[in-house]
Amino acid sequence: MSLDAASHQPAARRLLDSALVRRVLACMIIVIMIAISIWILTYVLFL
C-alpha cells in the first residue's frame, strides 16, 4: 500500500532523492575537510 502511494507520488520521491544526495555530498565535503586538516596537522608536526 505504501509502495503504491510512493509510485503515485514521483515529486515527493524526487525531493527525497535530492535531499539524500545533498546529505551525502555534505558528508563527503566534511570528511574531505577533516582529512585535509589532519594531513596539514601531521605535516606541521613532522616538519
Curated annotation (Swiss-Prot):
The keyword Membrane applies. The chain crosses the membrane at residues 27-47. It is found in: Host membrane. The gene is RL9A. Keywords: Host membrane, Membrane, Transmembrane, Transmembrane helix. The keyword Transmembrane helix applies. GO terms for cellular component: host cell membrane; membrane. It is a single-pass membrane protein. It comes from the Viruses. This is Protein RL9A. The lineage of its organism: Viruses, Duplodnaviria, Heunggongvirae, Peploviricota, Herviviricetes.
